[in-house]
């Protein structure tokens, strides 16, 4: 049997093949931005695949909201906020993600010789930068600093079995500002990989993670802005 294919059909197939090749070789950057976690976020995806930008935004914002309700020490309904507010030495059951971050923080604390210390929350509050801090017009006294320091120490938070954590001091508080954003960025990256993206850049509050080779195949390039100097009149 002879198979006759119209010439116009061959041309259409050829054009479609060319179009697909062109798109693959010249992927575009799709960018989403927003505010969450008390800061700004940005996601850049380099892809040649058609997808719903709004559906991706919805997934990202839902993930950010989910993480904020776990790691925030500002919002009353957050797991961390409630842990900090529990003035007790009775073992407390905490969210698995919060427990994982606490375990990792203990490891970093050990590796850094105690320099990284999430129990620094009382000091942060004393200087007016925490959720219960007050705007200060004077420097805290040595006595105030000493009292706040007495409430710190990773040795004062104990990991127990079955996801339980015990404070050895009821007033002990945790501040994961130095690590939570990195954990959340990792979760956003996992989300993007679930969308089958393999070339993207995620930034939350100045913390960045890149995946893939970027637009030119040499990796993503991030620029660092120079901080203002006193002579600019921006610092006192």
Walk through the language-model features, giving the residues of each.
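Single conserved hydrophobic/aromatic residue that forms the stacking wall/gate
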Residues: 225-236
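Mature catalytic core of soluble alpha/beta enzymes
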Residues: 2-227
């Amino acid at each position: 049997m002879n198979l006759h294919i119209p010439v116009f059909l061959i041309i259409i197939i050829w054009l479609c093949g060319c179009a697909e090749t062109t798109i693959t070789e010249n992927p575009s950057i799709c960018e989403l931005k927003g505010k969450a976690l008390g800061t700004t976020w940005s996601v850049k995806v380099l892809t040649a695949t058609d997808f719903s930008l709004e559906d991706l935004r919805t997934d990202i914002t839902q993930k950010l909201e989910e993480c904020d309700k776990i790691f925030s020490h500002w919002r009353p309904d957050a797991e961390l906020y409630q842990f900090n507010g529990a003035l007790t030495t009775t073992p407390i059951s905490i969210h698995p993600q919060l427990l994982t971050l606490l375990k990792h923080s203990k490891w970093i604390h050990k590796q850094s010789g105690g320099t990284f210390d999430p129990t620094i929350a009382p000091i942060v509050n004393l200087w007016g930068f925490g959720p219960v801090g007050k705007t200060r017009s004077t420097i805290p006294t040595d006595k105030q600093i000493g009292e706040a320091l007495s409430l710190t120490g990773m040795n004062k938070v104990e990991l127990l079995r079955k996801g339980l954590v015990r404070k050895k001091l009821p007033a002990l508080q945790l501040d994961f500002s130095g690590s939570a954003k990195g954990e959340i960025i990792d979760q956003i990256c996992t989300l993007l990989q679930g969308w089958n993206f393999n070339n993207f850049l995620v930034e939350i509050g100045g913390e960045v993670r890149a995946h893939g080779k970027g637009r030119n195949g040499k990796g993503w390039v991030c620029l660092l802005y120079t901080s203002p100097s006193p002579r600019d009149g921006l610092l006192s």
